């Protein structure tokens, strides 16, 4: 990572406007890696799951050829949604495994909000609340993701 005093800097595809992996207007991933290399930053946060190749045999050499290392990545997934738990845990497994293979060391969890939650964001009085049972299931799902990350040598 580029170091400045006690600050370590890394770049991410999100810096290039890649907020969602499936956006048809995203720039080509190899172009983004070329531009990150040209910026002088030598460490990468992998950005939205699915934007960069998920095969470490493809992505690893692409990063290495540009002198880029991996810090980790984030999971922007519907952790809140009980019905999508299997999908979320699958993404956690795939993503943690990829980060491990690329010698990264962290996984950041970002809960993808529902339309209802977005509509009331910043308005505490009208925001939807989880009941106790949902809160317990949510926290258990977060713990499961943390366990998956830990089994891959990552901090979550």
Describe the function of each predicted region.
Residues 117-133:
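Active-site gating loops and adjacent loop-to-helix segments of metal-dependent hydrolytic enzymes
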């Amino acid at each position: 990572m580029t170091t400045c005093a006690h600050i370590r800097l890394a770049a991410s595809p999100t810096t290039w406007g890649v907020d969602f992996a499936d956006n048809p207007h995203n720039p080509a991933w190899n172009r983004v890696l070329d531009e990150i290399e040209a910026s002088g930053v030598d460490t990468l946060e992998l950005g939205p799951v699915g934007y960069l190749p998920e095969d470490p045999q493809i992505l690893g050499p692409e990063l290495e050829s540009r002198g880029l290392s991996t810090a980790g990545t984030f999971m922007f997934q519907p952790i809140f949604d009980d019905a999508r738990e299997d999908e979320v845990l699958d993404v956690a497994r795939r993503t943690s495994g990829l980060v491990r293979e690329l010698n990264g060391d962290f996984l950041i969890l970002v809960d993808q909000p529902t339309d209802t939650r977005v509509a009331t964001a910043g308005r505490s009085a009208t925001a939807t609340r989880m009941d106790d049972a949902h809160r317990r299931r949510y926290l258990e799902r977060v713990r499961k993701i943390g366990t998956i990350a830990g089994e891959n040598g990552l901090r979550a």
